[in-house]
Structure formats: structure tokens, C-alpha cells
A protein has these predicted regions:
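Membrane-interface interhelical connector segments
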Residues: 29-44
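Extended, low-polarity transmembrane helix blocks
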Residues: 1-29, 47-55, 59, 65-133
Length: 133
């Protein structure tokens, strides 16, 4: 059953962060449009914050997928989710925004679990730790 736990941890990590990988890549492809969308919410210095969001999403998701510095990657996603959720998804009179808020809260929970437990056996973290000692 250890193999099942390891396999499920790997698949769970990938599925948890695919949305962030896709979103980060999408933001690169539509940088100006995304910056304009952010400005509609009263944000200033949108290019700076957008660049940060892209870095957090891409580095965090790749870290989690590879299982390399997994807890750090999960932390990057957690830090990204807090302002994103509070700035863009708190209009609860809009059902879609309420769903987006709850989706982000759920992903926050998944990242907290990953931060607490680590990546598991099918990860670079595990293999490097095992190799060292």
C-alpha cells in the first residue's frame, strides 16, 4: 500500500497545482490584458504585482509538481492565494465570484496539507534526502 500512497501523493500534487501553472502561463501570454483587469479593481503598480503573481504561480507550481522544495512551493501558492482571493473574489452577490472564492479556499486547504506533510516518496525532495543519508 506504500506505492499507492506515493502514487496518490504525486497525482494529487500535480492536480492541485495545474491550475496555477496554466494561469501563470496564461498571464504571460496576456500580460497587458491581465494588468488592465487588475487595474479595474483599483490596484496600482499592476505590472509589478502581475510579474510577482506569475513568478509565484510558476515557481510554486513547478516546485510542487517536481516535489523539489515542495513546502516552499506550497507556501508560494498560499501567499499568492491570499491577496488574489481577497481582492478579486469577494463579491458574494455574484454567484460565480462566490464559487471562485470557495475554490480558492479549497486550494488553500490543499496547499496547507502539502505544506504540513511534504511531497511524499515520489518526489525530488525524497530522493535527494535519501541520497544524502
Amino acid at each position: 500500500m506504500e506505492w499507492l500512497k506515493a502514487f496518490c501523493s504525486l497525482i494529487g500534487r500535480i492536480l492541485l497545482v495545474l491550475i496555477f501553472l496554466n494561469s501563470g502561463i496564461g498571464k504571460i501570454g496576456n500580460f497587458d490584458g491581465t494588468a488592465q483587469y487588475m487595474a479595474k479593481f483599483g490596484m496600482s503598480h499592476t505590472s509589478f504585482f502581475l510579474f510577482g503573481a506569475i513568478v509565484f504561480e510558476l515557481v510554486g507550481s513547478l516546485s510542487v509538481i517536481l516535489g523539489y522544495f515542495t513546502r516552499f512551493g506550497a507556501l508560494l501558492i498560499l501567499i499568492f492565494l491570499i491577496p488574489t482571493t481577497l481582492i478579486f473574489h469577494t463579491n458574494f452577490s455574484d454567484r460565480i465570484q462566490m464559487i471562485m472564492f470557495m475554490k480558492n479556499v479549497s486550494m488553500f486547504g490543499g496547499c496547507l496539507l502539502l505544506f504540513a506533510t511534504g511531497a511524499g516518496q515520489l518526489s525530488l525532495d525524497y530522493f535527494l534526502r535519501k541520497k544524502r543519508g
